[in-house]
Every structure is written in structure tokens, then in C-alpha cells.
From Swiss-Prot:
Tissues where the protein occurs: Specifically expressed in meiotic tissues. Highly expressed in testis.
Short name of any one Pfam family annotated for the protein: RAD51_interact
Gene from which this protein is expressed: RAD51AP2
InterPro entries (UniProt xref): RAD51-associated, RAD51_interact
Region (Interaction with RAD51): 1111-1159
Stretches that traverse the bilayer: none
Descriptive protein name: RAD51-associated protein 2
Region of interest called Disordered, as start-end residue ranges on this chain: 1-35
Subunit comment: Interacts with RAD51.
Cystine pairings recorded for this chain: none
Cellular component GO terms held in the UniProt record: protein-containing complex
Amino acid sequence: MSLPQPTPRMAELRKPTSSLTPPEDPDSQPPSSKRLCLEEPGGVFKAGWRLPLVPRLSEAEKVWELSPRPFKGLLVSTNAIFDNSTDSCVEKSVSGKQICNLKCSNLKFQMSSCLQSPPSQSPDSDLRASGRSEAGLHDREAFSVHRSNSSKAGVSQLLPSTSIHDIHGIRNENRKQQFVQGRDNVHKENPFLDVTFYKETKSPFHEIKNRCKANSVVPSNKRENNISSSVLKISKSQNQPSLEIAKPSYFRDSGTISVPQFPMDLNSKMSSVYLKEIAKKKNDKKEAYVRDFTNIYWSQNRPDVKKQKLQNDKKTVEAENIFSKCYENDYPSLSSQNTCKRKDLISSNYCNCSSIQCNVRDSRKNFAILENANWEEAECLDSYVLTRLEKSQNWDCNVRHILRRNRGNCWIINNCKTKCENMKKTEEKWNWLLLLEIDLLSKEDYHCAKVINAYEEQSKLLVREILGSQTALITTVWLNGKGENDNTLQLRYNTTQKVFHVNNPFESFIIEIFYFHKSISGNKKDNSILTCCNILKCKKQIGIIGIQNLITRNMNTNIKNGILSIYLQDSVSEPLDILLKTNIAFLLNNFDSLTRIENDFELEEECIFKCMLYLKYPKNIVENHTAYLVKILTSSRLLEDNMKPMLKKRKLFRTEQVFEKSKKKLINSFSMTTQNTGFPIFETYEKIPLLMDFDDMDEISLIREITCQNMSCPQQVVNVENWAHYNSSTVKAHGNSCPQFIQNNRGYINENFYEVNMHSQDLNMERKQGHNKISNFDCEHIFEDLCNVRQQAIPASHNIIHNEETHTTSITQVLNFWNLLSEIEEKKYDLILKEEVKVTAESLTNSCQVHKDTKIEKEEKDSFFPMDDMFSVQSVSLISKEVNVEENKYVNQNYVTNTNEYESILPEREIANSKDFHRKNDSALYINHQFETGLSEGNDECFQDLAAKYLSTEALTIVKDFEMKRKFDLVLEELRMFHEISRENELLSTVETNNGQENYFGENDAEKVKMEIEKDLKMVVVNKIRASSSFHDTIAGPNMGKSHQSLFKWKTVPNNGEQEVPNESCYPSRSEEELLYSTSEKDCETPLPKRPAFLPDECKEEFNYLLRGGSHFPHGISRVRPLKTCSRPIRIGLSRKARIKQLHPYLKQMCYGNLKENF
């Protein structure tokens, strides 16, 4: 690419600095459309119109002594740079280059600028307009200068050889920096690359106030100069990386700069840094597409970088090496930069002036964004940038996190990606406590600290830090409250929803927002809440202590009038919401340490503490529902005297129905309420469901109900039922939330999972039946195979069959409960309670014994239960594995005894009214009798008759499945026998090898081998007989017919070491080969039946039975007989080349059956 020739216009601009023209000079003209060129290599530009020159690599540039490098921009105020006329001087180095040293006494930093011009380089050769002619560049508004009638400006130009430290500042007589004058007469700062430029405003320029500090450069006050900074919106394509480019003054306010793509080949001619602008009008808005900075990806391996070194200038060479390493290391991070999409953002690019260790263009590391909610009311901001030290991996601790008040506007610190890499390496924790304390102390009206949106990889570390400082944070919130804010203090953690996962340490969070309210009583001095809340720590921690500490231990309240109210608002994501809801009941069962009673206080029935549990479910509840959980204070010694009259006058417990639809629908129910008791029980005043539905759950509820009548009746049986029902998905997903909720992989309900959905007893039924009551309740119990059994009525006998684990836990809970009562009640009540506990324990143990005796190995079973005083058969989707007739008889006997007991318990008038009861009962007994006889005889017609007459469609399918399984078992047994015969043939195959060894061994050895083989065969036969007999004793047994019992009778045949062939019992006529088999009676221990072995009619019956799925061998399976013509053993049934007649008898049967079906 050839360089253009210099023009006289550019030569006029390039004069020494001493001849600079002030901006007030009317002779200073803006640059024309002509090309600008360089006058001489060592010259300095005239301070006219300053246009940004971007270095560009070409082959002509390789002769430069100083290689081009990316610029580092600084936000420097004009007063900071040009404060003193004596601070700036122009020196000339040994090599003839002019160096401009800038000194600022107030800021204590020095900046050196080395200027070099190439031999013949046009200053705007890099500024090209695509699709347009270069002659008309001044007519384009994208790069044209808007002039006004009142002021004019000059240009100062930068050469591409500018060093990293080089800052081009030019002083004039009025100590003002030369700016590009906008159309609104607003001066602009030096337009370096990647520097933040001031946005154009319509107010005149008065003065720029210097606010440079130790580690930050601050823009001036808006009230003084009405200057605000902005960052360009860079449209980032999906497949192309982009960079944030500062918005120069010669772009419009609404203009945006987008970076489409950049050449990745660093050595190509397209790798130079230049700007390509395209002006497009869209709704009076212009977009300038700027070519990306590709030269920043420097590599030391480039030949032009190695050759180009500046003589006698060590600083420039050092800066070159450092930046080459910096950009080479940060190459992948530059391609993944985010773009700013808002106009009202303040971007501060800060560079440490004392070193070159900070990468300005890496926006993820080096600058943060402060967002202001109301831009018009914004005050002057102290901008800050997180700096990174090159050698140490730790972030600078002196970085100031500033939280500014802006007339009620809440500032948001958005550091999504800062401090992420180094925190990951060094595992340092952010001091969240200090950050939140600054925010709380800086605000008086609204105490809300929005925690920085954390990076996803650092969520664990952040949560651990927050959990560690939780107590201190709550104390800080409480101490910072003033006056009217005591009732509205809150500490809010706002974190992204991406961080909330159940597996993360956020599982320890149960409640996100805590509201601390003073007591409602008039005397607030006695009601101080000091140590209120700790987060529920349910994972791998003591849950009881954490829940007890959650409720306040406020001891200095006035018990008679004070009411403690704690609002717990849940506004977290779904996983934490689920954890909270699953632990509600566990939280409610541990309210023993809620309060304590002072020594000289008499308990009254009205003096109670109300704990208001305020739950907010954004998805499920439209309105905020509250549930008042009432608990009367308990103290074993202080309440003993006061509770005696209460126990005598009224019942021990009185249950109430909370939900009207709980009998019909058992979901969303918290049906346990108690009232007027002296024990730790709860009451709900409003009919509001505490536990709501979820998308993935049907039921999440945990209720304990204890029903008992008046304690004056010593014969009353205390009925305490603890039934377990829990959703399997809930157990798997949220089982670890609490120690009481133990997770099991199968979803099996362990002994600690409880749900009771029970209804209150009917008093009228209790009066009619007396002590022999029938408790109506619906129970859904989950077995190991998740079989649902609904029991809608149970007789008076308490032998309820359910899991042994439930029995043991219920016994322990009964004992614990009555031990609690024994501390408060009198001795006579203690004796009554002990007797009742014994009765319940005996009934439970009896039910456990019944459960042990009736172990039926089924996944699902037929249940016969009473329903509305009538017995009916309801089948519950069963496929049984093994059913014994003896067990069925035992169950039927228990069933008959239960019906007899039920008839004896019910009044005679009820039995007389139910006329259909005996009919249904007789029909049920008849069904049972027919079922037993059908099983014993093995008659299929019995099942068909039962199915046609009495059974329903569901029961009919069950009977068919049962019959199919019975036939399938027979087929499996036949296969087992077939494999045993094949194993015997393998043993016989050893005879062939032994016959081959007779040449080497004597006849005695051959005889010994034959004797051993015969012994092995006999042992196999004996084992088969034992196995078949044991099999028929256990499985076939009485539930198989006599025809089935006669099957599979083995007939042992002593052999002489030769291969045996099975008896031919499947073809209707003999063939010529069948005459070759030996049929002597000596070879058989048991003779064949007297009737002929081969009858066509019998074969037809056998084949018909086989087609139905059975295996009917009336003559049994005899031992294989040897062939007369065979001189050596034959592997029958195992060779691939074997014929059909050489196969196993079982295979012959199957082949013949298939042929018959085909015909």
C-alpha cells in the first residue's frame, strides 16, 4: 500500500510548539478536504484541528525506529495537565526527537511523550470512508467538524509512534488545552483512543474542576460545568467479537459505534489499526462502524516488532515488552467483552500512572459501571476502577467502594465480572460485611443493600462469607435503626436466580428477608428484640438448635400485655421456597424455647404469645395470607399448680376442622388445630393453607393429630396414629433439608416421614358404639413398591396392618407425649396414662405380629374391606410374584374372623337395616371358596366362571394375569430341565476323549474312567430328582392340579458309557430310525405305562395343551437311550448340523407344534 504525498496544507500545520496559535486566533481554520501530510521527520504539529491518528502497520512502517503500539487513555482534566505554564516544556532528545514532559505538582505524576514522525506518512491516511470518495470527507457529518460563529479551534495531531507513556499536551498562552470545538461550543478533552470523551451539551463551558485523587481520575462536577460522560453503544454481533470504543466529540450524541469484525491474521496487511466510518441516516441517527483494534493483539514473535527498537531510549523498549506480554496473555479475554447498552452509564477507565501493569482495554478487569437511576438528579460521582497488579494475584485492597446517596435513588454496584479470576485462584473472600455496613450507615430512610451480582463460579465462596457474617450483619441493622425505623428494619440479599441451586451452599438459606417488628404493646421499652434471628441451617447442622434460635429469646417483655410478632417473609426462588415449606412442621414442633416465664407470674388462659408466621408465595398466593400459631407457655414446675383445674374441667384435646374441603380433598391441608390446652400444640384462626401446591408436587404437608376423650374415663383407649405419606420427588429433591427428613434413593418412606390427614371423630357414632368406635379416616400409605391402599373403614380391633417402622415410631411418640403429660398432671392421671400407653403398645405389637404372619410377597394385592356397611371386592392393580394357597387360606380365615367381630360389634338394628350385607358377605365367601378350589384343582374354568359371574373387569384381568404367570412358571421349569440335560451331555462327551486315551493307558484305566462317569451321571440324576421334588413341594404343591403334579417324573436309566437318545414320544407313527433305539427293560429302572406309548389321540391332546402354553408330558421324560448303530457318542441337541430327529425331545415338541400351526 503506497503512502500519499505530503501537501502544503499539512506542512503549515506542522510547526514548532513555540508558534502555536491560540484558539481565539481568527486565522485558525479547520482542516480542508485535502490530504494532510508530514513536513519533516522531526517536526511537531501545529495546534490546529486535532484529529485522532491511529497507527497503521504497513511495509513502509518497518523502517520506523519506534514500532506502533496501542494507546492507553487517561481521563485527565485540562487544569491538571496545563495548570502551570512552567510545568510544561519541550525538550529535544539526543536522537533528534522532541519530548514533551508534563508535570503536575498537585497530582505528583509525570508523563513523558515521545513524538516521532515517519519519513512520509499522511496523518489521515488511516481515516478512510468506505463507499465514499476521500475528497468529500469534509462533507460527511460523521467526521466533519461543526463550527459555530463564536469560537474557533485548532488541531493537534498524534503520530503513530506514540509510546505508552506518551501524552500529547500542548500549552498555549491562556493555559487552555486545544479542543475540537463542537457545534454547541463545548470543549472536548484530548481524543485518545480508548478514552472516555465528554458528551456534548448545550450549556457553555465555564471551568473544569480538578478532582484527581490517589487512585482515580474524576470527571468534573455537573452543576459547575454541565458535562457528563457517556459510553458508546457497540452493537455486538453473534459470531464476531467487539470492543468498547469511547465516543469522540465529532460523533453525534445519538450515534453508535459498532465493531463488525477484525482480521485475525496479525501479519497481514489488514492488521493495521484504523477507523472505517460509514454514515447512515436512520431516523436522524447515525451509526459509525469502526474497524476493530486488531493491533492490540501483539505478539513478540512478529518480525517487525523485533526489528523496530528505539535507540538510546530504554523506557520505550521496556514499555513495548510489557505491553506485548500483557496483550498476549489477555488475548482470549478481549474477544469476550461485554458491551454497554445504556446511554446513562458512567465509564471510568483508570490507569495506574506509575506503572504499565494495567490493561485498559480489558473492560472485565479494569473498570466498573455505576448506574444511576435518575440521571438528571445525579451529583458529581467519584469514579473508581479496580486495578490489577501484574505480579501479585490479589486485588488492590485500597480500592474504594463508594456508595453514594442520590436523593432517594438506590445505587447499584454492578461488578459482575470483576475480581473473579483472582478470587478463583487465591480463594479470597469479599468483605461483604464492610460493604453492607457502608450502605446501611450512608442511608437513613431506606436500609437496603443490594449485594453485587456475583459471578456463577464464585457463588459458593460468597455464600460462605455471608453465612459467616450473618450475626454481625443483623446486629448492624438493628443498631443503625433510628426512631420510626424500628418497625421497618430489614436486611435484603438480592442475588441472581442463577446462583440459587439446591446443591449449592444456598441450601442453607431458608428465609431471605427478615422483618423485625417491635411488640404491639404500648410499653416499647420492655419489648426489645436484641438477638432475633439466625438462618435455618438444615444441611449438616443441628436443625433443632437452629430453629430454636430462629425464634427470639426475648425475656424482658411484658407477658400480660406484650405480644411478640415475628414476620418471616419468603421471597426467594423456588428451591428455597420448597425448603422452607418442607421444614414448617419441623419448625412448629420445636417451639419449646420460644419464651420463658418469669418466676412470680401466674399463668392465665389469655396470656399467650402469638407467633405470626408471614409467608409470601409469589406464584401461588395472590394475597398475603397469615396464620396465627398459638402456643401456651410451658414450664413443668411453674405450671403444675395452674394446669390442674384446667385438666379437670375440660377435655385434654379438642380438634377442629380448618378446611371445609379437607374430607374431599386431602391436598393443601393443615388440618391440625388445638385450643385451650397447656401443651405445645397449635391453633390456626384463619382457614388459610400454610402449605401450597407446587408445579412438581402434589402434597407437601406434615401434620400431627392426637385425639383423646376426657381423661376422667380410665378405660378410654388413646388412639395416636402417625401415618406417613410423602411425595417421592420431594424426598429425592429436598430430603436433605432437615435431619428429620431423611432422603432415600427409592423414595421409600422412612420412619421419620409423617403425614396425617385425619378427620375429627363423629361424636354421634361414639355415642352409639361406645368404646367400640370406628374412626373414619382416609389414609394413604406408601409401601416400598409405592402401592396405594385406601382404607375407608376399620373395625374396632386395632390390629391395623401397616409398616413396622410406623409402629415403632408411633410407640415412641406415645411414650414421649405421655411422659410430657406426667410432669404436669397428678399421680392418678399418670397411672391412667401408663395403663393407656400399655394398651396402645400391646395393640400395636399385636398388629405388628399380624403383619409378620401375613407376609404376602406381592407388589399389589386384592383387598376386601367394608364400605358403607357392605362388603365388596375391590382389586388394586395386582401382579403377584408367588402366592401360596396356605397364606391365602390364612388371610381368608382372618377375614372371616374380622367380619364376625364386625357383626358382633355393630348394633342389631344396623345389621337388620343392611339386608344386602349378608348377600354380599355370602357372595364374597363363595368367591373365596371357589378361588381356593380352583387353585387346588388347577382348573381354568373356575377362574372363568368367577370372572363371568362375580368379578369385575379389573378382577378379570387380574385372574388372567395370574393364570398366565402360572403357565409361564411351568415353561421356565422346562427350560431349567433342558439345560440340565445339556450339562449331562457335556459330561458324556468326556467319554470320547477317554476312548482316545485307551492307547496310552491300559484297560483298567479305561474301566476306572467309565466307573467315574457313571457315578457322575447318577449324582446328576439324584440331584434332578431332589430339585424337581422340592420345586413341586414349594411352588407347584397344592395349588397345582394332580395332572401337573404327575409331570416331570424322571426315569433313571443306567448306561454303559454310551450316548443316550431320548425316547421317541412325539410322533404318531414309528419310522425306520426309531427301530434302531433299544427298548429293553434292563435299561429302565421304571417301566413305561401299560397303554401304548404312541397314540395319535394322545399326541393331539399333548399338542393342543402345548399350544395353550402348557407343558404336558403324561409319560414323563425318560433318559436318553443309545443308538444301536452308533459306535461313538453323539452330541445330541448341541451341534449346529444336527437334524431335527437328533434334537432334544422338548425341541421336537416345539418344532412339531410350529409345523402344525403353519399347516
